[in-house]
């Protein structure tokens, strides 16, 4: 028979007492303020070029990201999700961004990992930095620099970063700026390794995640201008202390892999596991409908409405098991999409019919906590199957900057809040 012995009172006191560190931690939490969903780097046989070197050899990668909300401390998350071998990080820094590749020198901080300035990333794993004392305001632009001292295959990236990144020889993590004209310096608009930036926040702080495709990822947004529709939404929610994270991937699909894993497979990693997410907006379906039969997926069959509904039902089930609200967004018009390209068959009347059926279900099913009718907001009243010309980037599929702003400004903000009072805006003073 198993016997149980009482513990001495002094030992009980040691076990259940709260240390000063624990007390401090109880007053704060970590909140996702910016994300870029990881993708596997594809080969040269894909329709679109990857636009990254196959191997980095002793290079520094410098990237800029705009936070949604700020805080007194930050930490950085790197991703090696699709790597097959360990990846060595030799040094890493974070700083407030200046112009281009330049940094605000007084803000430069060394990143450490378990107290060490270097680390090894396990295949398939993320790497989270130690917290850094760097007070950052809402909507701050941060520069993250990472040095890879050993030959490193580029297995994980985010293809459409909408920002210039610099790849420079040697350890340039503490450089005031990186000169693009210098021998060996390359640039790309993809993101390498960097997948999230978190800020220290008060308990109960919340984030809104956007799960989407190229319309969310900002395929036609102006480069370096933070002009994707989640960027404009972040500007509206920052004064209330609510973060916005972008889990869009250009070419993303709900049911099938494309230029990234299908949404059902990546939902946990890219949305539900992100700290502070209480609400997710889902804007997906156009690539499920339109990729099959094109150069993107020439041998695939288009899904049925029932299959799309079943996919959405799985997202809803995953989210609600975690207490996360789900906002459905209708799919925007796309008649005449991608003219003069190898994908001119992206739009077809039978695909349009399926889009209409999916939108009718999103609007009327009652399955979502709320609905954002982006179709009604973005369409041309004179030609409802097309984007309003003022919102059209020119490819008849993706909104331009004005269209992205209109989507963000057309949202009734209380729909996104999880019945909690948001905190005031964070205004940092650099020390």
Question: How would you name each of these model-derived features?
Answer:
Residues 34, 57-63, 78, 86, ...:
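Conserved SGNH/GDSL esterase-like catalytic core that processes O-acyl groups on lipids
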């Amino acid at each position: 028979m198993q016997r149980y012995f009482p513990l001495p009172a002094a030992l009980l006191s040691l076990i259940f007492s709260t240390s000063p560190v624990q007390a401090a931690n109880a007053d704060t939490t970590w909140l996702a303020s910016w994300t870029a969903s990881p993708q596997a780097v594809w080969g040269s046989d894909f329709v679109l070029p990857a636009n990254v070197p196959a191997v980095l050899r002793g290079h520094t990668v410098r990237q800029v990201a705009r936070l949604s909300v700020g805080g007194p401390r930050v930490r950085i998350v790197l991703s090696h999700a699709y790597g097959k071998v360990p990846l060595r990080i030799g040094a890493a820094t974070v700083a407030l961004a200046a112009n281009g590749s330049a940094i605000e020198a007084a803000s430069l901080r060394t990143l450490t990992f378990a107290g060490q300035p270097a680390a090894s990333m396990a295949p398939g794993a993320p790497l989270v930095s130690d917290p850094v004392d760097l007070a950052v305001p809402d909507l701050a632009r941060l520069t993250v620099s990472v040095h890879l001292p050993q030959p490193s295959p580029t297995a994980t990236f985010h293809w459409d970063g909408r920002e210039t990144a610099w790849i420079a020889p040697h350890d340039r993590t503490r450089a005031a700026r990186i000169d693009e004209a210098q021998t060996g310096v390359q640039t790309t608009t993809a993101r390498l390794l960097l997948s999230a930036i978190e800020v220290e926040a008060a308990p109960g702080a919340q984030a809104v995640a956007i799960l989407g495709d190229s319309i969310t990822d900002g395929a036609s947004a102006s480069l370096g201008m933070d002009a994707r529709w989640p960027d404009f939404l972040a500007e509206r929610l920052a004064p209330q202390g609510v973060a916005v994270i972008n889990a869009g991937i250009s070419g993303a699909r709900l049911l099938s892999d494309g230029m990234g894993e299908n949404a059902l497979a990546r939902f946990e990693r890219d949305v539900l596991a992100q700290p502070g997410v209480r609400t997710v907006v889902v804007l997906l379906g156009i690539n499920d409908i339109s990729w099959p039969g094109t150069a993107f997926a020439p041998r695939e069959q288009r899904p049925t409405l029932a299959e799309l509904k079943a996919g959405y039902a799985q997202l809803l089930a995953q989210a609600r098991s975690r207490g996360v609200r789900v906002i459905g967004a209708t799919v925007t018009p796309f008649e005449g999409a991608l003219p003069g390209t190898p994908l001119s068959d992206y739009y077809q009347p039978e695909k349009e019919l399926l889009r209409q059926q999916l939108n009718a279900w999103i609007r009327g099913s009652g399955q979502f906590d709320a609905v954002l009718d982006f179709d009604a907001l973005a369409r041309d009243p004179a030609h409802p199957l097309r984007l309003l010309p003022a919102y059209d980037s020119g490819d008849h599929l993706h909104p331009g900057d004005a269209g992205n702003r209109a989507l963000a400004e057309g949202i009734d903000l209380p729909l996104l809040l999880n019945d909690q009072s948001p905190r005031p805006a964070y205004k940092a003073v650099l020390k």
